[in-house]
């Protein structure tokens, strides 16, 4: 089974990333925290048998910043669409359109996620059409699919 994983992220620019933390941290500290999150999740992704993609915002941002953090061996492409749902859908549609059997899309500010969590999600996709990684607050940190589903 050909597996792909998309890291869905912003380019860590001071004042533009992790802005909800700015009452507590400086813009530079927020960008540094984001960089640390990117490195942590990238380390876990390397342990999984999947091709890794990075889907970034803003689309006119300097992708070299991300390449310096995550490495040049990944494919990078910009997020497209108006809403978060549209951007996620277009990302999954693009990567699955490259011939992958399954694809996981995940955020990057989840330091607790480990490679076994990702492997488990890929295992679920052997039996199911979709998988979600739930968060304690009722949201999700990961979505995986065999084919892009617009809903």
Where are these regions (language model features)?
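N-terminal nucleotide-binding beta1-loop-alpha1 segment
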Residues: 1-20
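Short acidic/His/Gly/Ser-rich catalytic and metal-binding motifs that mark active-site loops
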Residues: 13-19, 63-65, 141
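A short, N-terminal amphipathic alpha-helix
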Residues: 32-50
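Short, high-confidence coil segments that cap the C-terminus of an alpha-helix
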Residues: 50, 100, 127-130
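Short beta-strand/loop segment that forms part of the nucleotide-sugar
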Residues: 50-59
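Short phosphate-binding loop-to-helix
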Residues: 66-102
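Short aromatic-hydrophobic micro-motifs that form the base-stacking/packing surface
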Residues: 104-106
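Conserved donor-nucleotide/metal-binding helix-loop-beta segment in metal-dependent transferases, i.e.
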Residues: 111-140
